[in-house]
Amino acid sequence: MKRAYIMVLDSFGIGSSADAERFGDAGSDTLGHIAQACAAGTADKGRSGPLHLPNLSRLGLGKAAEASTGTFPAGLDENADIIGAYAHASEISSGKDTPSGHWEIAGVPVLFDWGYFKDEENSFPQDLLDKLVKRANLPGYLGNCHSSGTVILDQLAEEHMKTGKPIFYTSADSVFQIACHEETFGLDKLYELCEIAREELTEGGYNIGRVIARPFIGDKPGHFERTGNRHDLAVEPPAPTILKKMVDEKGGEVVSVGKIADIYAQVGITKKVKATGIDALFDATLKEMDSAGDNTIVFTNFVDFDSAYGHRRDIPGYAAALELFDRRLPEMLSRVKGDDILILTADHGCDPSWHGTDHTRENVPVLIYGPNVKPGSYGHRETFADIGQTVAAYFGLSPMDYGKSIL
């Protein structure tokens, strides 16, 4: 029985890539800087001491990071007994965004340039805004700028609740984000507005990767919080991913846990499981692993590393989340049996010690575990697509156009 379990620790980079200078990210290192802060005692909020990741260390995380940066992460166990295959991979996609990273993991790198809304203020074309107001029958809009999603709620959510005007904002990523109150504006109405925005952006040729619904609750600044009902409307990958090939060529099952289905525009997904928060995502993943049959991919995105800690530049929070994941990892490892393979990786970096609030261009870990996987170093992988090619070879799918099988 063949089953592949792919876990994306969203934004868990292990050192800036060779091309990071082009993105202003040379020197960024999500894992390394978190580990440094923990070792120095400056990340003791809600946790304490050096970064403690014994199970990830046994899979080769520390050694993969050392190969990426030349420095072993502070506090991790340099003498861990390695039980998995490990490597570090660089991205060849043109951007450092979520769809690019995930599509490349699935064998389809993004070699074109996404469209971006680059102006910090008055970010969106007036023609686009006018069409959204007219089609969705809106009283107007708020925002129209670059912002962190939590900051903009404290600034504009009260006015949004009074006026019914949705909050439009963007970032350095190829995104059009819409924040609305779940109760006063309504979730269904927000989703409908996002569908309209997706249509207008596509028809207008803006080449924007995602429209993101950002629902929230609360009644005053400091008390507003985003809910788990986020919904991403992505464009479809430009070529068949391993997920689509798994369904088309093998009649296999592809189970999305978390936001995976949204990232791939629902293409190549046979089952969607919603869950919010690391523990809930972990629980849902374990449940799907328990029921997975032959020719199944279970694919989970652990978004909180990125959304709750990376973008918010919260080093102690990120460290605590990694330690939580590591504590629960044995539950996952114990379910990997026979011919199964488990792959742990990331889609980009988001160094919580870095300036700004955006992603960082970094190498990512590729940690592979299974009873038939030979432990040890598998070096530097020149593209995330090596993961997709590995999965294609494992299941006997037709080869992907990019990447080399790792195993």
From Swiss-Prot:
Gene3D superfamilies named among the record's database cross-references: Alkaline Phosphatase, subunit A, Phosphopentomutase
EC id: 5.4.2.7
Sites where the protein binds Mn(2+) 1: D10, D347, H348
This protein's GO CC annotations: cytosol
Domain of life, source organism: Bacteria
Entry cofactors: Mn(2+)
Compartments it resides in: Cytoplasm
Keyword Isomerase attached: yes
Annotated pathway: Carbohydrate degradation; 2-deoxy-D-ribose 1-phosphate degradation; D-glyceraldehyde 3-phosphate and acetaldehyde from 2-deoxy-alpha-D-ribose 1-phosphate: step 1/2
Residues reported to bind Mn(2+) 2: D306, H311, H359
Catalytic activity: 2-deoxy-alpha-D-ribose 1-phosphate = 2-deoxy-D-ribose 5-phosphate; alpha-D-ribose 1-phosphate = D-ribose 5-phosphate
Annotated GO biological process: 2-deoxyribose 1-phosphate catabolic process; 5-phosphoribose 1-diphosphate biosynthetic process; metabolic compound salvage; nucleotide metabolic process
Isomerase among keywords: yes
Cofactor: binding comment: Binds 2 manganese ions.
Keywords, ordered alphabetically: Cytoplasm, Isomerase, Manganese, Metal-binding
Cross-referenced Pfam families: Metalloenzyme
GO MF annotation: an example: manganese ion binding
HAMAP family: Phosphopentomut
Function: Isomerase that catalyzes the conversion of deoxy-ribose 1-phosphate (dRib-1-P) and ribose 1-phosphate (Rib-1-P) to deoxy-ribose 5-phosphate (dRib-5-P) and ribose 5-phosphate (Rib-5-P), respectively.
Family statement: Belongs to the phosphopentomutase family.
Protein name as annotated: Phosphopentomutase
Natural source organism: Pectobacterium carotovorum subsp. carotovorum (strain PC1)
Gene that encodes the chain: deoB
